[in-house]
Amino acid sequence: MSSNRVLLLAAMPLLGAALFGQSSGQEMSHADHMEHRFDNAKELAKRFDDPARDAWQLPDQVIDLLRLKRGQTVADIGAGTGYFTVRLAKSEAAPKVYAVDIEPSMVSYLGERAAQEHLSNVVAVQAAADTPNLPEAVDLVLIVDTFHHIGGREVYFRRLAKSLKPGGRVAIIDFKPDSPEGPPKEFRFTPEQIVSEMSKAGYTLTAQHDVLPRQHFLIFAIADRPSR
């Protein structure tokens, strides 16, 4: 697989397999998993935005723990159909939200959804192969169920650091090894593995929240910068 193809996954949308699991009888190769495409946004929205997800995703608690302030800016990388993007935009802090995705159909869908819901603080962003293409530095990067799809993570997160404001944070939410939902077992991480990888990329863990039953919830800052 080429390096560009691996990095293409840095802003992949939430995966159907990741959200709803894969039976133990199925086998998926590393290449198959990493190269899966998601170009039917309207159909995927039925799964990604299923209200039943709220019971284990706990979006309101997640947003409360992000402790956003008015006037701040967020990048939702791998925004998919906007599950967190829309909730962030409608939250009390009402931050500006860059809804970032690699799939053109997702980006179009996000733009249309923002317009339909009159969310002037949402901007849909088409990611490139090796960068989220953020138009400005942000206070928070949120990466939900996408970390395990990012190829060349050390390089990617070092580049991402340039898009963080001083005191900026990166919040990573991804599936636990024993979650009933999620990607194949080989694509799941322990918190220690995520912390180790982020440390190599120049980040330090500033918070770990154990409120989600099926996912890790870790927050990082640049190691040599103070966190907010």
Please state what every model-predicted region is.
Residues 117-130:
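Conserved SAM-binding strand-loop segment of SAM-dependent methyltransferases
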Residues 54-72:
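Conserved alpha-helix/loop element of class I SAM-dependent methyltransferases that forms part
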Residues 132-141:
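A short acidic, Gly/Pro-enriched loop at the edge of an enzyme's catalytic core
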Residues 71-80, 171-195:
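Conserved class I S-adenosyl-L-methionine
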Residues 103-104:
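Conserved SAM/SAH-binding beta-strand->alpha-helix loop
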Residues 154-169:
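A short glycine-rich, Lys/Arg-flanked "PGG" loop and its adjoining helix->strand segment in the class I
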